[in-house]
């Protein structure tokens, strides 16, 4: 089973894929930035970076977890951007 979460932040597309047996993947603008392999039982974290032309970069952190269904939280520079609250 595959679950996909996505958000566009300041013109950059952030996508997280979660599968039961192939782990989790973080893509930023279509490029793979982090990956966890295998089956995660309770939670996982992924890390990435938004690279801006002017040189300032922003850190991405993804938290995945859940008992029955997978929930996803995406943070940019420690600010929650997905899901919107």
What feature does the model see in each segment?
Residues 1-85:
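Terminal leader/tail segments of proteins
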């Amino acid at each position: 089973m595959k679950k996909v979460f996505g958000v566009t932040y300041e013109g950059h597309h952030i996508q997280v894929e979660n599968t039961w047996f192939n782990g989790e993947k973080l893509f930023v603008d279509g490029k793979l930035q982090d990956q966890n392999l295998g089956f995660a039982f309770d939670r996982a974290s992924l890390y990435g970076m938004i690279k801006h032309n002017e040189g300032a970069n922003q850190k991405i952190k993804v938290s995945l977890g859940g008992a029955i269904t997978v929930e996803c939280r995406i943070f940019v520079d420690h600010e929650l951007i997905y899901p919107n609250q």
